[in-house]
Design a protein with these regions (language model features):
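Active-site hotspot residues in diverse enzymes, especially metal/ion-binding acidic/histidine motifs
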Residues: 1-231
Length: 231
């Protein structure tokens, strides 16, 4: 599906607007953990269901699907078996992103099955522009910039961390220790705890911190499970 380019700033504003609209409807201030399921059902007016999408689409790489005409977001129920809460919630937020950003493009070009036109989220399409946009929306929705920056000041420092080393280079017992790449799961966990991001994975958190320029990784080693801790 071809979709127009949208800037990060525009996507972030749409996520903020959705939270603010939900706050007005619900009558209380929303803080992390962001109640994405309630937002989908109450603010967007969609039905959220869980099905075995592998059987529906005949493929094991489908995480979710957004049916525009029937106003349904469907999440692969197998995520309950094989994934963390963070992955499940992020997928819900991702599909909400498709609804907010892309539903107007489905009528003509949407992929169809028995339920009508749908936007189908597949692992194999992860690098496609439409999937990147939905991923970025999900990150902005679950980890609002204001709350992230507040938590970062509590956990880390007023200024961004510049990371120059993959491993700890300071001798044990030294008072000062520079941040290093292999420390990222602990930084992410501390951020999730300090900011109340209990439904966000450590991997999603560390990506968000780098995107906002709060962690600047100057090494060639990525901050992820596969690269940092490979055998």
């Amino acid at each position: 599906m071809k979709i127009p380019w949208i800037s990060k700033e525009q996507i972030a504003l749409k996520a903020v607007d959705l939270i603010e609209n939900f706050q007005t409807m619900a009558g209380y201030m929303v803080k992390p953990p962001i109640p994405v399921e309630d937002i989908i059902e109450r603010s967007l007016g969609l039905r959220l269901v869980y099905e075995d999408l592998g059987k529906v689409f005949g493929s094991n790489d489908v995480l979710g699907a957004t049916y525009v005409a029937s106003k349904v977001i469907c999440i692969n129920e197998r995520l309950f078996e094989h994934s963390s809460e963070g992955r499940l919630v992020f997928t819900c937020a991702h599909e909400a992103g498709h609804w907010v950003l892309h539903r107007q493009h489905v009528d003509v070009e949407g992929r169809r099955n028995l339920k009508g036109a749908a936007i189908v989220s597949r692992l194999s399409d992860a690098k496609a522009p439409i999937e990147w946009q939905a991923n970025y929306f999900a990150a902005c929705l679950l980890m609002p910039e204001k709350e992230i920056r507040e938590a970062f000041q509590k956990v880390c420092a007023p200024e961004p961390f510049v990371i120059n080393n993959v491993r700890n280079t300071v001798e044990e017992g030294a008072r000062c220790e520079e941040p290093f790449v292999e420390q990222w799961p602990f930084i992410a966990a501390a951020m999730c705890e300090a900011g109340g991001f209990s439904n966000v994975s450590k991997q999603a958190m560390i990506i968000r911190l780098q995107d906002l320029g709060l962690l600047i990784n100057q090494t060639s080693t990525k901050m992820d499970w596969k690269t940092t801790f490979r055998a």
